[in-house]
Amino acid sequence: MVPVENAEGPSLLKPKGRAAETDGSDRASGGPHPPWARGCGMYTLLSSVTAAVSGFLVGYELGIISGALLQIRTLLVLTCHEQEMVVSSLLIGALLASLIGGVLIDRYGRRAAIILSSCLLGLGSLVLIISLSYTTLIGGRIAIGVFISLSSTATCVYIAEIAPQHRRGLLVSLNELMIVIGILFAYISNYAFANISHGWKYMFGLVIPLGVLQAIAMYFLPPSPRFLVMKGHEEAASKVLGKLRAVLDTTEELTVIKSSLKDEYQYSFWDLFRSKDNMRTRIMIGLTLVFFVQITGQPNILFYASTVLKSVGFQSNEAASLASTGVGVVKVISTIPATLLVDQVGSKTFLCIGSSVMAASLVTMGIVNLNIHMNFTSICRNHSPINQSLDESVFYGPGNLSASNDTLRESFKGMTFHSRSSLRPTRNDINGRGETTLASLPNAGLSQTEYQIVTDSADVPTFLKWLSLASLLVYVAAFSIGLGPMPWLVLSEIFPGGIRGRAMALTSSMNWGINLLISLTFLTVTDLIGLPWVCFIYTVMSLASLVFVIVFIPETKGCSLEQISVELAKENYVKNNICFMSHHREELVPKQLQKRKPQEQFLESKKLRGKGQPRQLSSEV
């Protein structure tokens, strides 16, 4: 639970041995926060939690397809490519929405965007519930994708702009915590409805009431004070700040906001790619960071968790859904400490730890799966009802074949088929027992699908199966403390307020575009090169992300958004290696500025810029 403090009380989450303040002299001496920086009252907490409900809904929608797909692919007789399209259609909607989301957020406000996205969630969910065809299913998933993209961007920006600077990391990361809780509930729902007829409709419909309630609640919450200042409503912004900070005098914080926004009205979208205020470097950092979020493989674990777990030995839909629930539990448990400690430890440290552990776990997972000797997975087989009946007698899994016909089983034991064949089940009614056998018939009328005939399940050590699951869980845990929550905190901080919405929308487009590409090809690539080599590719990407974080990502804990913007505007930001700026206060801040208040530091820095002197940033804790 987030500690709540009144206007008079000190911070309850100070880093040990260091002052938690963000203004000049008070921070250096370990004194209390100024009133405008202290305010993390109940109203701020309530607004942040209500907005973060979007995170829960996003997580639920991202995770629910993992189990729903197991039922839908059989009901609608989906091919491998169609399964990929069902999963990826959500990402198509998200990508399309991200292209216009920034304009909506900057023009109509962060709160209005959240309300609109909740309405889209309800509409898309209704379409999914009544969908009776592949086409309507795709349409509903696209609508859900629009909700996810718009909601994700608006929520991060909204919380970052209403939070006091010393609680910003905690409150923004709350959104990621809600996302993983939503994923966990999605996996629980997958398990609960795994054996219920048309259970996928219940899975898709459970979130509608919560989405409606959030839209209503957000209507009564305040707009972002920074957005109000951007629109010229300074009096309204002052009132909102007073409620959020639980203080009467908001002059100082309002002055800082106005000063930081004064020169930002002239930003255009194309300024993101120009050298002005070093925006080109900032957008490069943002785009590369979200690239690594996706290219390290986490989306595939999220969307195809149940499918992948079936391929490594968790055989039934129910068993695979239950195992994927463990993935959700690990995500929640791992995200909680990252959320609570981000303001003390810093986002950069968590990113480094997460990328390192991800690489180690992926190597282990790849080596283990090499030893399982999976000659082929049955992920892409045809899931028609006739093949579903076959599943009762023939088990498809890594290193497994079992059939009621013992002679058939012995005949194929140890054999591997590398080419495609059309397999159909035939029902032997001659002996009256209705035993199922296999017939490999060319041009049998069924779609071309791939099967594996390999060794008995007894040949696959149980230890390897569980070690593979353990490696997967460690990988998920590492992602949940690093590349899961931290990039969105960094993105909400590194762009100036006047262009933040458009910058977030562009990085969101990159995020969804890469996600779409990876998810749309995962099953195909896995069939082509095998799961072990997919793991090794993700390992290389995790190590590359570690190097990128060390070199380029700033440590912004304890700094105000205005201070961060001033520092990143330096043309020699990367050359000066300011990545660990929290540990180099005296090098970064002229002594004459250290005793001044934040707004004075900001204005003085602007004067220094006009004289051709380097722009400096007040350090955080």
Swiss-Prot record:
Alphabetical UniProt keywords: Cell membrane, Cytoplasm, Glycoprotein, Membrane, Sugar transport, Transmembrane, Transmembrane helix, Transport
CDD domains, A to Z: MFS_GLUT12_Class3 (cd17435)
Catalytic activity: D-glucose(out) = D-glucose(in)
GO BP: any one term: D-glucose transmembrane transport
Glycosylated residues in this chain: 195, 375, 387, 400, 405
GO cellular component: endomembrane system; membrane; perinuclear region of cytoplasm; plasma membrane
Region annotation (Disordered) ranges: 1-33
Extracellular topological intervals: 70-84, 133-141, 190-201, 304-321, 371-470, 524-532
Subcellular location: Cell membrane; Endomembrane system; Cytoplasm, Perinuclear region
Post-translational modification note: N-glycosylated.
Transmembrane regions: 49-69, 85-105, 112-132, 142-162, 169-189, 202-222, 283-303, 322-342, 350-370, 471-491, 503-523, 533-553
GO MF entries: D-glucose transmembrane transporter activity
Annotated tissue distribution: Detected at high level in spleen and skeletal muscle, intermediate levels in kidney, testis and mammary gland, and at lower levels in liver, lung and intestine.
Matches recorded under Pfam families: Sugar_tr (PF00083)
Bilayer disposition of the protein: Multi-pass membrane protein
Cytoplasmic side: 1-48, 106-111, 163-168, 223-282, 343-349, 492-502, 554-621
Role description: Insulin-independent facilitative glucose transporter.
NCBIfam families reported for this sequence: SP
UniProt similarity note: Belongs to the major facilitator superfamily. Sugar transporter (TC 2.A.1.1) family. Glucose transporter subfamily.
Protein name in UniProt: Solute carrier family 2, facilitated glucose transporter member 12
Source organism of this protein record: Bos taurus
